[in-house]
Amino acid sequence: DFLFVGPSAAQVLANMRVAAATLHEFGLVNNLAKLEGPAQSLEFLGIRIDSTLRTLSVPDRKLEAIVPKLEDLLSRRFVSVKKLRSVLGHLSHLSMVLPAARPFLRGLIDAVHYRQQESRRHRRLSGALREDLAFWLHHVRGWNGSQSWRAESDPVVLASDASTTGFGWVLEKAPKFTCDRLPSFMQPGHAVAGYWGEDLREMQSLSNNIGWGELFAPVAAARRMGPALRDSHVVFVVDNAGDVEVINRRRTTCPRMRTLLRDLCKLSLRYNFAFTAIHRPGARNILPDVLSRPSIHQHDLRVPSVCDKVTKEVIKDSIPKTSAPEPKPFAFGSFFLLDPMSKSAASIPLMFPLG
């Protein structure tokens, strides 16, 4: 199948004629019965594309078909591999419109391809798989099947970092419609710093757990901004290449990180924002790095003090001036205050106000 996109119906029609002639020259048959368009709304590979409403949508018949299949699976203890594959195919198709829902397919994929049971025709539904299926059932029931295109040309940019003792992030950039939704103390240029709670401190002190901390920071930032991210495109800037891959592929084999990734995806589905991650070398990610290290900022988070510490880190690392960040990273204002979290909630990383 071929999809032609152009600025006008005449241009698209001309492109279609050229393609038809080319296919004919190679002896290929054009199936005119499947021809559709030119139009501003058409169905391609089972997905309806509407350039006027700027939406991608799944036809109602596909949504209606998956609901009874999910209900049937959830009513059983053992399910045939054939039924699991059928549901997996339907949900994989839906995830083309909802890429943030892909992490909730992992359990179903594992159940279908579990090697130790390949010879068995039925699978037992685990508690985790049931939770995934229930998530899909709940979401499909309340979803109209469409997803709006996001404003990707002017993204929200969040830079973050984490260490074995803490984490931090700064809102570097945001489009006007996002800024209008944010209070004055959360505008671009404002930042957050935090440290790990008591029951996380020992675990996060191990360097092999740094990936979880690096992922926690952007997830916490997205949760904090919440509704302000609606219909936007969020770019997470991190200095951990592994986390960049996890965020962009919506996939991880680490159970702890999978929980965070699912939280991020749920936020994306709730507020309809797209998200991607890019890698910034640690030598250039100085401000988030300072915020993530209590040993450096020593809880003195006044703007002049943090600016001084950032400058010292730049000098210490001997970064060429052409690639060094500006010495005054808070040109848009001071830090914003973050409500302190109760120390009794030891399972939650602790955050403190920034002065």
Name every feature range the model reports, one short phrase each.
Residues P38-W149:
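C-terminal reverse transcriptase regions that engage the nucleic-acid substrate
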Residues D1-F26, I47-V58, L94, G242-M257:
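Catalytic palm subdomain of template-directed nucleic-acid polymerases
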Residues L28-E43, I47, F273-I286, V290, ...:
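Acidic carboxylate-rich catalytic motifs and surrounding loops in phosphoryl-/glycosyl-chemistry enzymes
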Residues S153-T165:
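Two-metal-ion RNase H-like nuclease active-site motif
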Residues L23, G46, I66, L70, ...:
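Mobile genetic element proteins and their domesticated derivatives, centered on retroelements
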Residues P175-F216, G242-P255:
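A short, polar/acidic, helix/strand-boundary loop motif
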Residues D1-F4, A10, R223-L287:
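RNase H catalytic domain
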Residues I49-V87, V290-G355:
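Flexible, low-complexity interdomain linkers flanking nucleic-acid-processing modules
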